[in-house]
Amino acid sequence: LPPVRQSRLAAPPAPQPHQRPHGVGFTPMSIVIRDVREHELDSVLALNNNAGSAILPLDSARLHAFYEKAEYFRVAERDGNLAGFLVGFGSDSDHDSCNFAWFKERYPHFFYIDRIVVASRRRGGGVGRAFYADVQSYAELRYPLLCCEVFLDHGADPALLFHGSFGFHEVGQNVMPDVDVRASMMMKELCSYPWVRETYGDNLPDLPWVGRPRRPQPRTSLATGT
């Protein structure tokens, strides 16, 4: 398992035999995945809002709410530049997404990927696979299920194939009322969780690669001089 707080991965990580198609080559590169820093939020916002129709737009207030509340909010860095980000919430989180609510109505304990965004110039270079390896290594120590959605109205085949190659399957569909977008609700069972839970309960070892959930992050206030 990769380190949680900061991991340097050869990306993309070697998939399981059923994940690598014959004849497809991979170019190794160095990617660092680490917790986001508050001063990077403007860059994260720009990445999100330039991602196209497959990702819902954000405003600064909602992004700061993610920063303050998300259990997992990490960025990928390559050559000193942000290459993407992933935001996730545990099932007990105070998160107001309608897709998160859809899962919460049906499953008592899960980890939800709210969004993953990869910079356009980095797509196809393994950043997404590096993120999913990292978020799974975090989630499987704490949750039995990993959940997300794929929008079906914007050329979904690449995203569906990507998630299928990681073992996700559709468990239903949801029409998002505010934006009238139909989403494939996808889930993956995390096979390591039962053993981890039985062996350690809530007392995971204090190891660097195990890490800890992000704590609530108060927004920094700037002095006004008044």
Spell out what each predicted region is:
Residues 139-152:
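Conserved GNAT acetyl-CoA-binding A-motif
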Residues 31-44:
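A short beta-loop-alpha structural element at the N-terminal edge
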Residues 114-123, 151-153:
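A short, internal acetyl-CoA/4′-phosphopantetheine-binding micro-motif in the GNAT/acyltransferase core
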Residues 53-79:
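Active-site rim helix/loop that mediates acceptor-substrate recognition in acyltransferases
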Residues 152-172:
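Conserved active-site alpha-helix within GNAT-family acetyltransferase domains
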